[in-house]
Amino acid sequence: MKIADIVAQKKHFPFFDCAYQGFASGDLENDAWAVRYFAEAGFEMCVAQSYAKNLGLYGQRAGCFHFVTHTEETKTRILSQLEILQRSEISNPPAYGARVASTVLNDEALFREWEDNLRTMSGRIIEMRGRLYNKLVELGTPGGWGHITKQIGMFSL
């Protein structure tokens, strides 16, 4: 993968923000492909996952932070720093959202239902992109609008 090669060549540190996992393709596994690729390629990296959007837990601060490393020493140092940051930033995070996320992630039937809901939402996003594109073309709106249907996810540039 070209991006991974450049990141390695320039000695950059990858940080993935997975705030909308499942919305791009409708599949959690597919949307996490790049993260798995970098991990399998041996990169140390950070991954932030939020359940605010894809589980509808807005304002609940439900999510995960992962630091992928290869040494026990680095793991110990990172854990120490994360504990300090967590204490100063959110010493008492809301528990409700974390409980909901944990319940969904650990119950096979609820997890499958969540995956089905993500597929539905992703399909709706694709449908809305198509409708927006068609309306812009129908109205003769100046500009090229092909990017709206070529891109994926909730946002369009």
Language model segments and positions:
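Active-site pre-lysine segment of PLP-dependent enzymes
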Residues: M1-F13, C18-L57, C64
